[in-house]
């Protein structure tokens, strides 16, 4: 693994003693505001958002190897985290311009890799929407953008975690059967691309290569993949990159995410951990809005703890150390 000693030390700060990244994701901004807005009539305030992130950091970071936060609303939470919990900070603006084609990436204009590092980040995380089948006119802009961030992170000697979310402009619903059919190729080809040395990515944060709701044995309705086909997609994903890679939870339930990790492991995917967000903490949002801070804290200490504890047990049996990847 051709990483600097400083980068290796930083990734170690984000991992547990077994070399597994069991990270809590709470860099949601737009999605979090929408979740909160479902339970109150007024617009969520900055103070409300910041305080919920603080609560989650105070209650759950003792069980996570690291936490991913955003520098817009998450800095108080970064100060509230457990002293042994590493810190990733997000560098991208939330969401994308729905009126423009291509879901082009955009950095937070007040931040840089240098500033995120000065803020105490052990790594920089950037989210990229990518469709390997989009036009070269769109994709060349995205490649150049990621090259810039990679070079910034090399200059600052800080790990670069690239999160890739796939899409297809011709299939508006990425939960559909149509998208499920094209997802494996889109996920795995994007991983292959951004593993190239020119991008200077250190860890990939990726989707599982199938929609588990359409896998035989998991599906309640239509089946898109047999178990064997789904397993092959996970195998293909593992050989698509030489880099450490971790799974995102994509908003599915805690139970489904844990079952997915077991399936991935049985299929032969040697993934190196997770950055799990809503599957762990989403139930706290409604409690926080409707019943207040103390009730939310109680939810985090009980259900939230169970979610993260169960996940950690599954990771112990399924994930492998990032140090084993070459």
UniProtKB/Swiss-Prot annotation:
InterPro entries: Aldolase_TIM, DeoC/FbaB/LacD_aldolase, LacD_aldolase, Tag_1.6-dipho_adolase. Coiled coil: none annotated. It is an enzyme of class 4 (lyase). Pathway: Carbohydrate metabolism; D-tagatose 6-phosphate degradation; D-glyceraldehyde 3-phosphate and glycerone phosphate from D-tagatose 6-phosphate: step 2/2. One of its GO terms (molecular function) is tagatose-bisphosphate aldolase activity. Its EC number is 4.1.2.40. GO terms for biological process: 6-sulfoquinovose(1-) catabolic process; D-tagatose 6-phosphate catabolic process; lactose catabolic process via tagatose-6-phosphate. Pfam families: DeoC. Signal peptide: none annotated. Keywords: Lactose metabolism, Lyase. Belongs to the aldolase LacD family. This is Tagatose 1,6-diphosphate aldolase.
